[in-house]
Regions:
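Conserved catalytic core of the tyrosine transesterase superfamily
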Residues: 1-315
């Protein structure tokens, strides 16, 4: 094992101990370290980081920038123990990685998505039930996609109206209360699921017709299919489902709609924001503040609220 590989193991352990789910970055960094090792260089160089970041060549520039950002953070950490390490400039591949602005689905968009998902064909008629209920749950709770997919039956308390979210992005569990109408929808899905699949092979709440837990990949694919069906994604050649609104935008919609409702109702958003952060599973309130900058309507409402606030008077 090379010195750089050992350093990566230490770096990965450090990030995980800080509470980060680091599987994908760690996997990418292993390919980066292998790339550096194969070049014969004993340390990270700017040119090697650039060459690695620009793979695959047909990827979007934002993907290259994201790959570079992962390598760059590792290089910053590595430089403390190996001064030979070169830290590549953040804009080395033409642009910095930035979070994509969210697409705020309208209520009509969500209804069309759910209705089209419910009509998805399948042999046992469970597929439509599963994805219509899943997409609806994401829209009204703001759960991350993996949080919903990792729900077991025991995590869904339909008597109390509470979901127990165990496998979160940062490894912390939390309780998510749900509306009575959401309870009813989950109850109806559970009854349909158990009728169609009386002997499941898993305790997963959301289940495939193969009696197994549905995967993130197939869920994202199905969402893309349904988005094209309702016109939210443009048609493309070769049967691909193109670019457009993403499934995580359902989470963004929930957060944004909550904040917009608070502003319009005159709620003290500064005081209530930590509650929304906890509900969403954000570790830092700053992650929730991001919506104020990313969504023009929220930025305008915040500016209007600030303009209405009387200035402080110092004695």
């Amino acid at each position: 094992m090379s010195d750089l590989s050992e350093a990566l193991n230490e770096y990965t352990a450090m990030r995980q101990n800080l509470g980060f789910v680091f599987r994908l970055p760690a996997s990418l960094l292993r390919t980066f370290v292998a790339f550096v090792d194969q070049s014969g260089s004993p340390f990270i160089t700017t040119e090697l980081a650039r060459q690695w970041a620009l793979q695959p060549t047909e990827a979007q520039p934002s993907t290259w920038a994201w790959r570079l950002s992962i390598a760059r953070r590792f290089a910053v950490w590595r430089r403390a123990s190996d001064p030979r390490t070169e830290v590549p400039p953040a804009d080395l591949v033409g642009q910095r990685y930035r979070r994509k602005p969210p697409r705020l689905y309208t209520d009509q968009d969500v209804v069309r998505l759910i209705q089209s998902a419910a009509a998805l064909p399948s042999a046992k008629k469970l597929r439509g039930h599963t994805y219509a209920t899943l997409f609806g749950l994401l829209a009204v709770t703001g759960l991350r996609i993996n949080e919903a997919l990792h729900l077991d039956r025991s995590d869904v308390d339909l008597q109390e109206g509470v979901l127990t979210i165990r496998r979160t992005k940062f490894g912390k569990s939390r309780l998510v209360p749900i509306h009575p109408t959401t309870q009813d929808a989950l109850q109806a899905y559970g009854e349909a699921r158990d009728r169609i699949i009386p002997k499941p092979a898993t305790q997963a709440f959301f289940m495939s017709e193969r009696r197994t837990r549905i995967t993130e990949w197939i869920t994202r694919y199905t969402f893309a299919v349904v988005s094209r069906m309702v016109g939210l994604r443009p048609p493309t050649r070769g049967g691909r489902h193109g670019h457009g609104p993403r499934i995580q935008d359902l989470r963004h919609r929930f957060a944004a709609q909550t904040l917009i409702t608070w502003y319009r109702a005159g709620v003290d958003v500064e005081r209530e924001l930590p509650k929304l952060s906890t509900y969403l599973g954000h570790v830092h309130t700053a992650d929730t503040y991001w919506y104020l900058e990313a969504i023009p309507e929220l930025l305008q409402l915040a500016a209007e609220r600030l303009a209405q606030t009387p200035p402080e008077v110092t004695p």
